[in-house]
Amino acid sequence: MKGMDEYEKIINDLNTINSKAKFIGIKIIMVRRIIDMHKDNDKLIKKVLEGIKNTDLYDLVLNACPELKGERIKDVYFKKNDYFNVIKKTMSSENTVLKNVLINDESPP
């Protein structure tokens, strides 16, 4: 691991957890622990998030640390297709509440 940048080591650790841990609860706890160790370093967290964008690992990190969905990632670059993919997944899901919000601009109950 010599010569590895700190963000690369974090991504490597996160990948190891994701591939080795059997249960989602364990994965979430372990991922949360790693992110919490670096929570005060916004630049590093953003670099990690950019490095894992569009992967299952990205979704796992955001599930483990929902606070990263807000202000911290506002500067992370999102491609236009990301938005369309989210909308497409929502529209093809069975979640009628989300569909109503998207189509009719209704607020959830």
UniProtKB/Swiss-Prot annotation:
One of its GO terms (cellular component) is DNA-directed RNA polymerase complex. The keyword Coiled coil does not apply. Keywords: DNA-directed RNA polymerase, Nucleotidyltransferase, Transcription, Transferase. The keyword Glycoprotein does not apply. Its EC number is 2.7.7.6. It catalyses: RNA(n) + a ribonucleoside 5'-triphosphate = RNA(n+1) + diphosphate. One of its GO terms (molecular function) is DNA-directed RNA polymerase activity. It comes from the Archaea. DNA-dependent RNA polymerase catalyzes the transcription of DNA into RNA using the four ribonucleoside triphosphates as substrates. This is DNA-directed RNA polymerase subunit I. It comes from Methanocaldococcus jannaschii (strain ATCC 43067 / DSM 2661 / JAL-1 / JCM 10045 / NBRC 100440) (Methanococcus jannaschii). The lineage of its organism: Archaea, Methanobacteriati, Methanobacteriota, Methanomada group, Methanococci. The gene is rpoI.
